[in-house]
Design a protein with these regions (language model features):
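Extracellular/periplasmic periplasmic-binding protein-like sensory domains
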Residues: 242-320, 331-332
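Periplasmic-binding protein-like
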Residues: 89, 93-102, 120-124, 169-172, ...
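Short, low-complexity disordered leader/linker segments with a strong preference
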Residues: 1-28, 59
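Extracytoplasmic "Venus flytrap"
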Residues: 30-49, 73-80, 102-103, 171-180, ...
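Extracellular/periplasmic Venus flytrap/periplasmic-binding protein
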Residues: 81-84, 128-130, 138-245, 288-294
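Beta-alpha junction/loop-to-helix N-cap segments that form part of ligand/metal-binding clefts
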Residues: 41-48, 62-133, 144, 203-211, ...
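Signal peptide-proximal N-terminal region
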Residues: 24, 47-70, 190-196
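Segments of small-molecule ligand-sensing domains
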Residues: 302-317, 323-370
Length: 370
């Protein structure tokens, strides 16, 4: 039902543009993203952000005289499924570009598809360093988020400030993102606070139905603080199970989660069950600041109107920024040829509702603050 509704929104957005307003066929953007399962809580808002950007751009005449058409597909947060639907989008639907995926299992796999087909692929959220490290980067992959090295450094810097913390544990999903994030954190923490001992590391799978064994195992090691990379439905399930067991109270709420759970999405899902006093980040931290840029206010108002939600998602902005970046690349290249667009995007700066961003020439990332 959710997928049908999102596809309907995309069609409705396209219908708002008068017929005959464009000189040529649409620029097709394939959008593999989780629209079902525990990660849909993020996947759906990311897609909605992209759809909003496309709607606004089309209302202003499109790009190079052509409208944008987003073709969403449910990747199910699974690498094989993300590859399958991406190839189908390229071969069957003839998409010009790929934008999407959510996890660091999907994105590296789709990056390979993009390389094989010489098609630009923008990953809105995948953070694993493997996506853009020197051994794996290719000319067609770009990322509008930061990476796990930055994430781990930030978490370690904050953790190191707690002078009374002597023992630390980690809990992260058992795949590239979680492993990379925890490793980066531990590496930096050892530099900053060599006196701290890592007493436990737990590795639940994505979509873990019951976190109780991991929670009780970690509590038995009596850490003073915890670093986590749990996200989406996993963080929601974990929090609901951990709080009654006294998990957060046992560590005096010294819990840092680097997986963007400091958002309205989790607050809405958990309500009063949201764990008090924890520290986390957000793809759209401007939501919580007093000095909100005018452009961001406009974006939030437009997003609420588009989604008919009372509270704007903290994840939609990365989908929105991905389309903005792609469109600027197309305009700079004055072409939809991926080789030309990819070259145009190297070192390119682009405007977003939270300020300018720029793709690194070396790593194709924006290192966006969160």
């Amino acid at each position: 039902m959710q997928l049908r509704r999102l596809i309907a929104w995309a069609a409705a957005a396209a219908a708002l543009v008068p017929a005959g307003a464009f000189a040529a066929g649409p620029i097709k953007i394939g959008f593999p993203i989780p629209l079902s399962g525990v990660t849909a809580v993020y996947g759906v808002p990311v897609l909605q952000g992209a759809q909003l950007a496309a709607k606004e751009i089309n209302a202003k005449g499109g790009v190079l005289g052509r409208k944008l058409e987003i073709l969403p597909r449910d990747s199910k947060a699974n690498a094989d499924e993300a590859v399958r639907v991406s190839r189908e989008l390229i071969i069957k639907n003839g998409v010009d570009f790929l934008v999407g995926t959510l996890t660091s299992a999907e994105a590296p796999a789709v990056s390979t598809v993009a390389k094989e087909n010489h098609i630009v692929f923008i990953a809105p959220t995948s953070k694993s360093t493997i996506l853009t490290d020197p051994q794996h980067i290719n000319p067609y992959i770009f990322r509008v988020s930061s990476n796990t090295d930055v994430e781990g450094l930030a978490g370690a810097t904050l953790m190191a400030r707690w002078k009374n913390v002597k023992t630390v544990a980690t809990i992260a999903p058992d795949y590239a993102y979680g492993r990379d994030s925890a490793a980066a954190f531990v590496k930096e923490l050892k530099k900053l606070r060599p006196d701290i001992k890592i007493v436990d590391q737990e590795w639940p799978k994505v979509g873990q139905p019951d976190f109780t064994p991991f929670i009780t195992a970690q509590m038995s090691k009596k850490p003073d603080a915890v670093y986590a990379s749990l996200f989406a439905g996993d963080f929601i399930t974990f929090s609901k199970e951990a709080k009654p067991l006294g998990y957060f109270k046992a560590i005096d709420n010294r819990f840092i989660d680097a997986a963007e759970v400091g958002t309205t999405d989790e607050a809405k899902a958990l309500g009063a069950e949201y764990p008090f006093g924890i520290i986390s980040d957000s793809y759209d931290p401007v939501i919580f600041t007093k000095n909100e840029p005018p452009g961001h206010k406009q974006f939030i108002a437009a997003l609420k109107a588009f989604t008919h939600e009372k509270y704007a998602s903290g994840w939609s902005i990365v989908g929105y920024q991905s389309i903005e970046a792609l469109v600027d690349g197309i305009r700079k290249a004055h072409s939809t040829n991926s080789d030309k667009v990819a070259k145009a995007m190297l070192g390119m700066s682009f405007d977003t509702p939270v300020g300018k961003r720029m793709f690194s020439v070396k790593s194709h990332e924006t290192f966006a603050p969160e």
